[in-house]
Amino acid sequence: MARGNTILCLRDQETGAETYECMIFALRKFTGGMGDEDEQQPEDNKVWTDYFLKPLDSTAKVICTRKANGEAAHLAIRFIENKFVLCVGSKNVHMLICDKSDIDKYSDGRFQVARAVAAAILNVINDLSEESVEFLCNFMHHLRLTAVFEILNPCTQHVEDLSHLERSELRFISWTSSYEDRKNNAHSYCAVNPQVGIDLAQKIGFKTVRYDIIQPTEVDERMDKIRHDYGYEGEVLYFLDSDENVIGLLKKKTAWYVVARAIREQVANALNDWNKSGSSKYDHAAREERLVKRLKAIKQWLDLSESSLSAWIEIGKGFLAYVIKLAEKSAKDNQVSVESEKCDGVSQKAFSNGDIELRNKFPQHWKTFLQQHQKSDRIMW
C-alpha cells in the first residue's frame, strides 16, 4: 500500500459518467532495523528485507539519501478542463488547487498540514522559470507521476534545528507512479532511478535531499557510519538492480536522533502530565523512571555502551527537570499571552500556564538547556 493514496473522480456534467484515476501514489511501505522506527520496533534487524521486490543479492548499487526531518509532502499535476490542476497534501490528506486563493477553501482543521504543503509548493513554483513550470506540468501530467517531498517547517520542528529557515521549504525526494498493470505488479518502488530523479528535480529548480552512491558490499559499513553520526536524523538507502529498478528501501537513523527523540517524547508526556495534574500531584520520580526505562530499551536496540547510556540518562534527567522548572516559572508568573504566534500564515497556540509547546520547539529548548548547563549531546559509544 502506497502512502497518500488519492483517487480522483471526474464526472461528466452532461452524461453523468464517472472516471477514476489514481492521482497520488507515493512511496510504498519500507522499514529499518531495531531502533529505526519511531514507535513499535521490528522483531529483528533484517525485517526490512521482507519488503524487497527481489532478493537482496540482486542489488547492483545503492543510493543513499539524507533523511529530511520534516513532514511528508506530495504533488501531482493533471490537465483538466483546459487548465493544470495541482493535487497537494501530506500523508492521507490532499486537496485540489489551481492558485493560492484555493488554499483558503480548505478551512477544516485536518487540512492544516496540507495547507502548509500547498503554500510551500506554490512558493517554489512561483520561483521557477516559465520554461521549468511548463516542463514540470506537462512532465507530471503525461507520465502520471507523484513528486515526493519532505516539508521543513520552522514552526513545527522535531529534533533537527530548523530555526534558520524564514519560511517552510520543500526537499524533493523521488518520483513515483502507481502500479504498472491491473494485477498490481510492481517492478520498482520509484518511477526512475533516484539519482536521475533528484538530478532532474534540481534542473527544474527544486531543492533536493543529498545523495551518495555506494556498492552493495559497502552497505554494512554505511549503516554503521550512519548510526554513529551526529546532528541529523539519518538516511534512506535505495537498493537498485542491474536494470535500475528500486527493489527495496531501508531507513537507518543516527543513534543521536533516536535517543534525542525519545527524550523529547518522554519529557513532553511529563509536561502534559504536569499541566493536567498540577504541581502537587505530579510525580517527578515516576517520570524519571519512565525515561530511564525507555533509554535502557533503546540501549538494547542500538547496542549502546553502558557509559553512553549513563551519559544519556544524566542529560535526559537534567532536561526533564529543566522543562518542568520552566513550566513552574511560567505558571507562577502567570505568563498568559493573548496573542497567537503565526508562522507561514498558520496560527499557533501561544504559551500559557506552562504549556511551552515542547514538541514543536524542542531543538531550541534542547540547545538552550545544553548551553546553560554546559552539557554536550555528542556522546561517543
Q: Can you name each region flagged by the protein language model?
A:
Residues 1-381:
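Core nucleotide-handling region used for phosphoryl-transfer chemistry
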